[in-house]
């Protein structure tokens, strides 16, 4: 799993590539805090671009939940976007699509967080 970053408007986009499983989850968790710091400092929401994530295991799902929990300690917001069909199916079966904000495209996610990066109602 590798991580590619960019900024678009009020969104820090983190693109995950490859697989998020037991072997890569620790690296993802270790890589996340500096991005959470930057997002909090710059008042950005984090959009996880999953368009190039091929697979997510139960350990990877746990990683997503921990990321959301960490973001809340920063008063931040994490949303996911552009899920591949297999990853989308895993999200649906595990009901993660009910727990996390899921967008069909990165552009839609960026538009959704544009007015409220931390998720508060305006």
Where are these regions (language model features)?
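Amphipathic alpha-helical interaction surfaces in cytosolic regulatory modules
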Residues: 22-100
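General small-molecule cofactor/ligand-binding pocket signal
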Residues: 6, 81, 103
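Intrinsic disorder/low-complexity segments
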Residues: 12, 40-41, 72, 110, ...
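Residues that form or immediately flank small-molecule/cofactor binding pockets and catalytic motifs
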Residues: 10, 85, 107
């Amino acid at each position: 799993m590798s991580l590619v970053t960019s900024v678009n408007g009020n969104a820090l986009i983190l693109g995950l590539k490859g697989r998020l499983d037991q072997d890569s989850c620790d690296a993802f968790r270790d890589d996340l805090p500096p991005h959470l710091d930057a997002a909090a400092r710059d008042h950005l929401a984090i959009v996880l671009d999953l368009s190039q994530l091929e697979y997510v295991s139960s350990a990877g799902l746990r990683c997503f939940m921990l990321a959301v929990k960490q973001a809340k300690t920063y008063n931040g917001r994490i949303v996911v976007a552009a899920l591949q069909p297999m990853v989308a199916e895993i999200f649906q079966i595990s009901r993660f699509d009910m727990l996390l904000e899921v967008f069909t495209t990165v552009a839609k996610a960026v538009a959704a967080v544009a007015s409220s990066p931390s998720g508060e109602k305006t």
